[in-house]
């Protein structure tokens, strides 16, 4: 940790105090943990970032995870960056009501900033976000750049917890922020489109901390010309889905393969209208080609042209309970898988397959076309990609 109590005053390791000054304070025995009031020792070595450490190994309620040198460097770097923006950050401010200690707290904005380097579960993430929300505190997660893997043009491996912390920009696109304290650089991921459980298409922007104003950039919409490249990535992903469906043995794939097989359909030859990035599709962690194909199949099997959205929702809820379908958790986004389902229905409406009659009722306009061969499927995917 970077903060301690000395004579009932907060002191920190981000200032200009010398090693000799910390040694003198330590000899007086007056350096205490602000949370548990136990004595702490100033660690002022040559290799690691200067910090305070507890004398004993007793658990302190104010700390949830061991700190690495990378994490402490990041906190110091972010602190100096905010100071340069004329902000007044408080390092490791302890919020006793919720027993949480954000890495940086901006009291003027009532805003907590977490620099996340260690592993954290999605349940822990949601719990911390809800803790801040219970005190009407805004919060943001900035992730250590080590957590992000760049796989090529517009392609990244994003950890599932990182993706859960995503917010929407002014255009409704997902975004995340990363920071590298070793390079003192921010990496902004914009227009994030998940392709699989970890793989996502995203546009990355690099900024030196000197050229990045968080409060101006946080929800700004960036140039979307790169979306042309996304089409190629998505087309490749659809090809992958088609080529691997027959040998994929996951419970979700096996279930939908079985349903289609008994209705004389092949999952490999799913309709070109399925497996598309419709509005909010990412609320399902299950691949879009699976749940969208099944939704089309449900509509196809209707004996009448009119259908209620409740009919589809009830069936999807059944599949969710059986864990055949999986969803993603986005604590910052006030939406659910039902938004993904409605987004896809509106997508089908734009392509003249269905039309909305009332808020809850839709009408089937024409039959869905299934490719008869893999070659035809690839060709239709390409044609559909160019049109959409």
Model-derived regions, located:
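Extended, amphipathic alpha-helical scaffolds
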Residues: 245-388
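N-terminal cysteine/histidine-rich coordination modules
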Residues: 1-87
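Conserved catalytic cores of phosphodiester-cleaving nucleases, focusing on short active-site segments
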Residues: 78, 102-121, 132
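Eukaryotic partner-binding/assembly regions in large regulatory complexes
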Residues: 203-258
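Catalytic cores of nucleic-acid endonucleases
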Residues: 117-170
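A conserved mid-domain beta-alpha-beta active-site/ligand-binding segment of alpha/beta enzyme cores
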Residues: 162-220
